[in-house]
Amino acid sequence: MAPKLQISHLGKSFGELQALHDINLAMERGEFIAVVGPSGCGKTTFLRIVAGLEPASSGEVELDGRAVTGPGGDRGFVFQTDNLLPWRTVFANAIIGREVAGRVGPAERRRTLELLKLVGLEGFENYHPRQLSGGMRQRVNLARALAIDPQVLLMDEPFSSLDAQTREIMQTELMRIWEAGRKTVLFVTHQIDEAVFLADRVLVFARRPGRLRESVAIALPRPRTLAIKRTAEFVRYVDHIWRLIEDDVRASVIEEKV
């Protein structure tokens, strides 16, 4: 079976700065892949290229055998920052992708309500973003991305602005939602434990130029609960990935101080 998402010899430069170099990836349908690496290794740039929001300088991205040349409804994007429209209700924010596509009927409205229930927001349909906590707003962002029924879900550090406790709750909620539909997910994070908890594979990026250092298969049983983070096997995965990026992380910290 052909890969759902095929990335071949992907490169990206900004003037003289080479941000990404020769990234190759074959992603299967229903696979959950996380991307980790030090600051400045091009993780977000990589995700934006896959989303069609940023052109590649070299190489190609194919989804179901078709070249990605721009944004499309076959990809849903959950951003790091909260970008809900403050004057729209939870329901109106969640269904906006369907409105843009000109496809809003009874079926789409029912599906949006089902998704809000799936992400734990049943009863909050008529609330506005200012009335919601950070975790609840990210649930709306997730429902909005799922409402267009994307083939691939792209997530750029969606829980980074949340406190530690809320972040762990959102990780378990994302796992529950993913298990229910098995979307193909590409998830960028700085948190190694988050990557190991969520993913089937973790792509470890090296810095400048950003390149794939290692693809780590995570052979932990599913479904996963937070208790798995206390197991020796989980800790071994986290330690292995940390050792892969430790030197680059230290170099990034020193560079930021200069």
Q: Each PLM stretch: what is its role?
A:
Residues 95, 106-124, 176:
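Conserved ABC ATPase "signature" region
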Residues 36-38:
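The feature captures the beta-strand-to-loop junction immediately N-terminal to the Walker
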Residues 91-101, 109, 217:
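Short helical segment in ABC ATPase nucleotide-binding domains corresponding to the A-loop/adjacent helical element
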Residues 59-71, 111:
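Conserved ABC transporter NBD signature motif
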Residues 127-130, 148:
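Conserved signature/switch motifs of ABC ATPase nucleotide-binding domains
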Residues 153-156:
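Catalytic Walker B motif of ABC-type/P-loop ATPase nucleotide-binding domains
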Residues 51:
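Helix-to-loop junction immediately C-terminal to a conserved catalytic motif
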